[in-house]
């Protein structure tokens, strides 16, 4: 058995007038992440971690923010396409550990639905998906509620 670890990170600016998508869940908030797609930082960080673990580059290579086909795309579709790429290399996901850093909104009430979304797309058990949240104690861009960041670590196993 061959195991591979991947790490992903994604940042997005928060702006008024955009929906707030996280882990495939639309969370009610007066700001949303600015981006070419739906700007779901959590799913983007997971995509990057999966691609990195499989030595397949990064999300920008496969889903460039200059391609019209990805404009406002649901990031669950990007995660599905990422899963197809790693599955083609005979990898399965062992587990995922994530952290989202933001001041608001509070997200943990939505974590179960996010875990279900991620597990469903990646064909894994919900108990293999961890989502945590933290703040920067009001420091930096996240602390000023100008943006947010998500971190993801994944473990892959070759079939």
Each model region followed by its residue ranges:
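C-terminal edge-of-domain segments
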Residues: 142-159
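RNase III-family endoribonuclease catalytic core
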Residues: 2-114, 122
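Short active-site-adjacent structural elements
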Residues: 108-109, 138-141
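Pyridoxal 5′-phosphate
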Residues: 131-135
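Short acidic capping loops at alpha-helix termini that bridge into adjacent secondary structure
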Residues: 125-128
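SAM-dependent methyltransferases
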Residues: 1-2, 159
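Glycine-rich, mobile lid/loop segments that gate access to catalytic sites or pores
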Residues: 118
């Amino acid at each position: 058995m061959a195991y591979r670890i991947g790490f992903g990170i994604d940042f997005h600016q928060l702006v008024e007038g955009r929906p707030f998508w996280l882990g495939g869940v639309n969370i009610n908030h007066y700001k949303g992440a600015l981006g070419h797609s739906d700007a779901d930082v959590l799913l983007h960080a997971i995509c990057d971690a999966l691609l990195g673990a499989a030595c397949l580059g990064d999300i920008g290579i496969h889903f460039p923010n200059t391609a019209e086909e990805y404009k406002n795309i649901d990031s669950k579709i990007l995660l599905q396409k990422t899963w197809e790429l790693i599955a083609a290399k005979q990898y399965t996901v062992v587990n995922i550990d994530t952290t989202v850093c933001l001041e608001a909104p509070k997200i943990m009430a939505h974590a179960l639905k996010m875990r279900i979304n991620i597990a469903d797309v990646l064909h894994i058990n919900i108990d293999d998906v961890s989502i945590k949240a933290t703040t920067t104690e009001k420091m930096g861009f996240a602390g000023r509620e100008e943006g947010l960041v998500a971190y993801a670590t994944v473990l892959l196993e070759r079939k």
